[in-house]
A protein has these predicted regions:
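Non-catalytic beta/alpha edge segments that cap or flank active sites
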Residues: 1-204
Length: 204
């Protein structure tokens, strides 16, 4: 059942943590709580979220992504976990399977940011796609599993004064959501400044 928006510009976010061990209670999931905290700091426009904690099973991941976009009506879906080279890491495969348009720039930029910190970022296979239905479209992105890496990829890199050195991927998300017919997203610039061409800016 589609979620009811409390405001025309309310962003519906789906957060999916993908982990065999966290989903069975072996350890506590850190990905979704980290994302909740980040959005609370980063967004100034209205939003609500739907969360899922599921195992590394491709069919389950695909079903969950489809449910969040097609049934719930999410505009943005973020996953954490399952993007490495191990046999059980199938999040990118599931994401590509449900997408109608690949968005390779997001994964490329995530790896560029993470390579500033660890050489093993090369092993990460994060992807992003647009999923389109006749009446709706959403952006789906894979993120790292660690809270520190999640923040780095979303916000990018800043110098000591807080000036952006390398843009984070979320800077491009609001305009992407505009282009696919979603709500107008506004951010806290000190956390992550949304970029739009002048023609796409809303007059306040």
């Amino acid at each position: 059942m589609k979620k009811t928006r409390n405001h025309p510009d309310e962003l519906l976010i789906g957060l999916v943590s993908i982990s065999d061990r966290a989903s069975t209670g072996v350890y506590e999931d850190q990905g979704v709580p980290a994302l909740k905290d980040w959005f609370a700091q980063a967004l100034t426009s209205p939003w609500q979220m739907e969360t899922r904690l599921i195992p590394d099973v491709q069919s389950t991941i695909e079903k969950t992504l489809i449910e969040l976009v097609d049934d719930i009506g999410c505009d943005l879906v973020l996953t954490t976990g399952g993007t490495g080279p191990a046999r059980r890491d199938v999040t990118p495969e599931a994401t590509l399977a449900v997408g109608t348009k690949p968005m390779p720039g997001f994964g490329e930029q995530m790896r560029q940011i993470s390579l500033r910190f660890v050489p093993t970022a090369i092993l990460s296979r994060q992807v992003a796609v647009i999923r389109e239905t006749p009446e709706h479209a959403a952006l789906i992105m894979n993120l790292p599993g660690q809270p520190k890496s999640i923040r780095e990829t979303l916000e990018g890199l800043k110098d000591e004064s807080g000036k952006s050195i390398v843009p984070g991927i979320f800077s491009a998300v609001p305009y992407c959501i505009d282009l696919i017919g979603g709500p107008y997203i506004e951010t806290q610039e000190a956390v992550c400044k949304a970029f739009r061409p002048k023609s796409a800016l809303r007059v306040k």
